[in-house]
């Protein structure tokens, strides 16, 4: 959530109109998320995760930047910017031409080990909930 909020603020500061901002984010599979929440929320009680398999219309991977969009792709440290087609758009000084062919959850950097659990714990701690 903090990263998504920062993306919105950065987009508001840098937007010229028509471009698309894409957060550079680590990926995980649903089983990792379930396991992380089980570890974060479990208080010793039996917490079962049931695997049911793929359901209709379910995506295995999310395409965030297509190969066609990658031709118009710029990047900053934290996000990608897809240049709009046509118009007088020009990249900000902080942007460089991205050197990727596409960006999807299958090829994105993955959360490793207990990293996702730590990410969730840090976020929950930032909420100051007792």
What is the predicted role of each segment?
Residues 1-130:
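Strand-loop microenvironment adjacent to phosphate/nucleotide-handling motifs in alpha/beta enzyme folds
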């Amino acid at each position: 959530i903090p990263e998504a909020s920062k993306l919105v603020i950065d987009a508001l500061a840098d937007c010229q109109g028509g471009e698309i901002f894409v957060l550079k984010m680590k990926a995980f599979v649903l089983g990792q998320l379930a396991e992380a929440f089980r570890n974060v929320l479990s208080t010793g009680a039996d917490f079962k995760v049931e695997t049911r398999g793929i359901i209709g219309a379910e995506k295995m991977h999310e395409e965030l930047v297509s190969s066609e969009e990658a031709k118009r792709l710029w990047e900053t440290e934290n996000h990608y910017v897809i240049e709009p087609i046509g118009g007088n758009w020009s990249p900000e000084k902080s942007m460089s031409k991205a050197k990727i062919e596409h960006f999807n959850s299958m090829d994105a950097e993955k959360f490793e080990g207990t990293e996702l659990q730590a990410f969730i714990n840090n976020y929950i701690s930032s909420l100051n909930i007792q």
